[in-house]
């Protein structure tokens, strides 16, 4: 079975029996590179034979040379514009544009013009440069030589290339009827399809690659988690990246002399923020001074930090004294750290909050199990844990194939020291999940930095879940 281009070459060789690759390219209109590959295919089929192969140097027009062949050389155009009469430099510059400097330089070098003040005086009324004549000859197939070739090379109007030339002989004639690609309705109704030869389809070949746009795979994962939470009856809430220490630490019953507040564990922002109503501030102060036994500072509570935990959003929600709520937030948090394959200075967390009158610790465990099973973790277990603002507290583990039991989240019932100053007296369950670590487990990512990659080839290779 022969392709259309193979048939073109064979039809050409039938008339000559023997020809060069360059003659074949000119006679068929095919690119020389295509001719070489088709000849190799035909030779492998035993239809043609390569008699000889040689490499020769050929002169070819550059892109600049092709342009000058069509438009004319700048010095020729300048002489034509002068037409035997003096003209101001500015007039010529306006007419020739960026070609003026080139044309003016070559025209003076060739003695075609002189310059008096700002006026160009022609010394000839007409001029066609030998270089232009050589360019036209080359276009017609006659290569330049000698001094003209040297000038054209210096002016980058031509280039000398090494070109392979094959001499090919037709060994046997074959039927050159083109293969049909499609069966038409007419062929089926008339039965004429039996008279045709059809090009076979390779059903095992990969389809062509189409680089279509798609959602960033990590963003897609986050959206899937959000959809799951909404499906479980939660509402999404959000907060600001810049937060006061009051909501980031104080409302969460974390003392002001806690090491986490030091500059090495939080990004401190210059300036002070505003505090909520004085009643909430007073109650938080009383709780800190009663249980932590130190003098609580309102000025310290007004300090600004880049939030180090999305629990700051939970604290904001609590400050509104909701009677009943099922809320979650997913967002970035910021902590000083050494960046490597498992650590970043900014990453995503998810915090959840449930406030219900009869909510129990057992309900919290059931909710967490529903979340992780919704994410595809079939086996979930719990271990006692400790967190500053929950009691009792629990660590959540999920079984991941190939990794075993992996810590997934921390959770617990919020302490009364956290909820009651905000006016919340119903049980409140809360949890925090490292979304980046979770995504690495589910997506098979080894380096956390790849979750934020902007490398197009890498992103194209990622499967969107």
Swiss-Prot record:
Cofactor names: Mg(2+)
UniProt entry keywords in alphabetical sequence: Aminoacyl-tRNA synthetase, ATP-binding, Cytoplasm, Ligase, Magnesium, Metal-binding, Nucleotide-binding, Protein biosynthesis
Keyword flag Repressor: no
Subcellular localization: Cytoplasm
SUPFAM superfamilies: Class II aaRS and biotin synthetases, Winged helix' DNA-binding domain
UniProt family annotation: Belongs to the class-II aminoacyl-tRNA synthetase family. Phe-tRNA synthetase alpha subunit type 2 subfamily.
Record's subunit section: Tetramer of two alpha and two beta subunits.
Name of the protein in its database record: Phenylalanine--tRNA ligase alpha subunit
């Amino acid at each position: 079975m022969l392709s259309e281009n193979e048939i073109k070459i064979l039809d050409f060789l039938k008339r000559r029996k023997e020809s060069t690759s360059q003659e074949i390219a000119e006679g068929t209109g095919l690119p020389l590179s295509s001719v070489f590959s088709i000849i190799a295919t035909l030779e492998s089929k035993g239809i043609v034979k390569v008699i000889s192969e040689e490499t020769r140097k050929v002169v070819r027009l550059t892109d600049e040379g092709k342009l000058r062949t069509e438009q004319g050389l700048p010095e020729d155009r300048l002489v034509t514009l002068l037409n035997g009469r003096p003209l101001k430099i500015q007039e010529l510059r306006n007419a020739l544009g960026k070609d003026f400097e080139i044309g003016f330089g070559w025209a003076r070098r060739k003695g075609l013009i002189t310059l008096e003040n700002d006026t160009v005086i022609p010394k000839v009324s007409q001029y066609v440069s030998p270089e232009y004549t050589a360019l036209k000859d080359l276009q017609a197939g006659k290569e330049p030589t000698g001094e003209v070739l040297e000038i054209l090379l210096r002016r980058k109007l031509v280039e000398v290339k090494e070109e392979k030339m094959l001499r090919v002989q037709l060994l046997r004639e074959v039927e050159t009827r083109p293969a049909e690609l499609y069966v038409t309705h007419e062929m089926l109704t008339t039965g004429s399809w039996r008279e045709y030869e059809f090009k076979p389809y390779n059903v095992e070949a990969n389809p062509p690659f189409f680089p279509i746009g798609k959602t960033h795979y990590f963003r897609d994962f986050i959206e899937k988690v959000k959809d799951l939470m909404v499906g479980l009856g939660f509402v999404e809430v959000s907060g600001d990246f810049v937060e006061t220490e009051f909501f980031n630490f104080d409302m969460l019953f974390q003392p002001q002399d806690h090491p986490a507040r030091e500059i090495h564990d939080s990004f401190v922002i210059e300036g002070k923020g505003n505090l909520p109503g004085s009643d909430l501030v007073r109650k938080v102060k009383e709780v800190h001074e009663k249980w932590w036994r130190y003098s609580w500072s309102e000025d310290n509570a007004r300090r600004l930090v880049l939030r180090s935990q999305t629990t700051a959003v939970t604290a904001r929600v609590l400050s509104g004294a909701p009677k009943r709520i099922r809320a979650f937030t997913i967002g970035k948090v910021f902590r000083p750290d050494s960046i490597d394959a498992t650590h970043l200075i900014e990453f995503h967390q998810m915090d959840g909050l449930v406030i219900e009158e009869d909510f129990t610790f057992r309900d919290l465990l059931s909710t967490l199990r529903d979340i992780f099973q919704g994410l595809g973790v079939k086996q979930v277990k719990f271990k006692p844990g400790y967190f500053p603002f929950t009691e009792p507290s629990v660590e959540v583990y999920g079984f991941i194939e190939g990794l075993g039991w992996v810590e997934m989240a921390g959770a617990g019932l919020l302490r009364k020291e956290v909820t009651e100053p905000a006016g919340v007296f119903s049980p409140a369950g809360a949890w925090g999940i490292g979304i980046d670590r979770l995504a690495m487990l589910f997506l098979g990512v080894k380096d956390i930095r790849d979750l934020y990659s902007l490398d197009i080839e890498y992103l194209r290779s990622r499967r969107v879940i």
